Amino acid sequence: PTPVSALVHSATMVAAGVYLVGRFFPVLTPDVLLVIAYTGGLTLFIAATIAVTATDIKKVLAYSTVSQLGYMMLALGVGGWVAGLFHLITHAFFKSLLFLCSGSVIHACHTNDMRKMGGLLKVMPYTGWTMLIGCLAIIGAGVPFVLGFSGYYSKDAILAQALLFSRTNPQHSILYLAVAGGAFITAFYMFRLWFMTFAGSPRDQHVFEHAHESPRVMTRPLVALAVFAVAAGWALPGGLGVE
């Protein structure tokens, strides 16, 4: 069920490994952290490239989760304890939102295949706009020095830590390139998901004719999570001990 996927893929089971590494961070040696960083970089890149080719809406989000976990592991590996756990927290909000939005779409269309969707924003405005907010949050959209979505702050912290690590260890500059490149790929597959689902004209008229907005009991949680997907990053850095 999609609500279970939202819980499992955002902040519980899949995040346990990141949480464990974060707890053991003070006792890990530099060599071990370097292995963790490269493992995270490889994970985020491979999972992101798979998400680019997926046509099942839930599989795109599942591989997106794997990619974001790679980000967190890479952050921990390059010494960014705060950055890694900060991204873990912001990820919980926008990934829960994205999975629940996908569940709303599947509930309306009775299919997971994005190739049969298209134009759904006309009949599912609440789901469409809240999912766009989730997409903007996961790609780290924002205006530098002004305001950004929650992912903007956590991903920026990871980028800054990876850049600092690459400057002090030039032989490992590929880790920074992995973070930066992964951010571009993330933006591509998330916008691909949204445009294939909600924009353009319907590709399957039968699916479109039966599509409808979900009831309020399903859309209200989307709006609540959308608020946190936007604003979670505004307050959390101070709570983590970072001004």
Where is each model-derived feature located?
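Hydrophobic transmembrane alpha-helices and their helix-loop junctions in integral membrane proteins
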Residues: 1-213, 217, 221, 228-234
